[in-house]
Structures are given as C-alpha cells and as structure tokens.
Amino acid sequence: MIELVDVCKAFGRQRVLNHLDLAVEKGETTVIIGRSGGGKSVLLRHLIGLMKPDCGQVLVDGQDLARMNNRQLKEIRKSFGMLFQDAALFDSMNVGDNVAFPLREHTRKRRAEIRDIVEEKLASVGLSGVSDKMPSELSGGMRKRVGLARALALDPHIILFDEPTTGLDPLMADAIDTLIRDTQARTGATCVVISHDLAGAFKIAHHIAMLYEGRIIAKGTPDEIRNTEDPVVRQFVEGRADGPIKVV
C-alpha cells in the first residue's frame, strides 16, 4: 500500500502540496486528476523518492521514503516501474536496449536471459519483433508501449504513469488505456496514474482522486466521482469554465 500523510511541499512562497493525505489501495489503479500546474507531477515525484517533502510521510509498504538515504531509495525503486509522459526512451539505443536497460543496471542476469525477458515484455504490450528498431522509427503510441515494456522489465509491484495518453489521438489514447487496464489486471500491480484524460480515467481506475489547491479534495470510485455533489469536482469533471474553479 502507498500512503501520503500530511505531505507539504513548497517552492519559495508557492505551496504546491498543502498537508496532503492520500491512500492508494494495493493491487488497484488510482488515477489522480486536477488542473495543469496543480502539483500532480510533484506528487508523483514524491512517490518515487525524487523529491522529499517539507513535512509529512510518504509510505510504501510501511517504509517512509522521506527518511531514506540514496542507497535505500535505489533499492526500493527496484519495485517500481514508471512510464514517463514522453516515454523518455534513449534515442541512441534501439528498442531492445531501451527495454533491457533496467535489467542491465539492476540485475546480474545473463545476456540470453535478458534478451528473452525483453522479447516477453515487448510481446506483452503488442510489439513483438521490434527490438532492432530505433525510437525515431516509432509512432507516438509505439513509443509509449516501449516505455511500458521497459517499466515492466523488473516485474514491479508498483507502476507509475505520468500523463500516459498525452499527445495521442483519441483512438491511440483508448488503446493505451486498454493496455494499462489489462496490464494491471494481469500483473496485479498497484498503479498510480496522473492524467487529464477523464474518459481514460473513468475507464481504467478503481479509484479517482482529485488534487486541488494542494490537497486531495475527493476520492472515490468512478461512479462516485461522476455523481459527486462537490461543486469543484463536478465543474472539473464536466469541463465547465464557470464555477468555483477560477479559469484565468
């Protein structure tokens, strides 16, 4: 289980996370929604230990990432996979080497075993036979799939997704959402997804949490969020400019 308890983070006078509390259920997908620039990516960086909170705890299976040193963080990150917003592939490496990268960095597996794992992970995202291609030869959707294959390389029990459908057309976005949903169901991983794509959020989430003014103001099942009476959440979900959220 992942739990953020009373987490604060400020940059100068701007408080981005304001005594935030959030529990992410084990083996489920939680999608975090909220306005652009509202702190969702900052929250995600805390979940993987790339940022330390000014106050509060970031608990992963009861261990506080905020109190870990670099060696401890490196060890616990082996249980994480992350799909970055732009897939973050190494342009100088072919697809196979991109997927193999965490295996070479964090394990002592033999070359043949790594090759087999790479092909297995690529097949699991529908990309068999592309190991020798370069990232520049791939479409945006294919790059996202390769990024997911790399995120799965170490069989993580926690997978983080940063805007996984940004920049994709609606058909490809739906395909990526389906892949995320199926991957979670197959692996049983705990997934945290940062997203503006409300249609995708309602499709893949077990729970949806809304971040607003530095706090999680609502969390519930897709149906609970869709039918909420909270005026802030309702305005955001309905995509209306008029309401308590000021649009400037």
Give the residues covered by each predicted segment:
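Catalytic Walker B motif of ABC-type/P-loop ATPase nucleotide-binding domains
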Residues: 159-162
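Helix-to-loop junction immediately C-terminal to a conserved catalytic motif
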Residues: 48
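Conserved ABC ATPase "signature" region
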Residues: 63-64, 111-129
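Conserved ABC ATPase signature
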Residues: 134-138, 142
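A short, proline-enriched helix->beta-strand linker immediately N-terminal to the Walker B motif
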Residues: 153-157
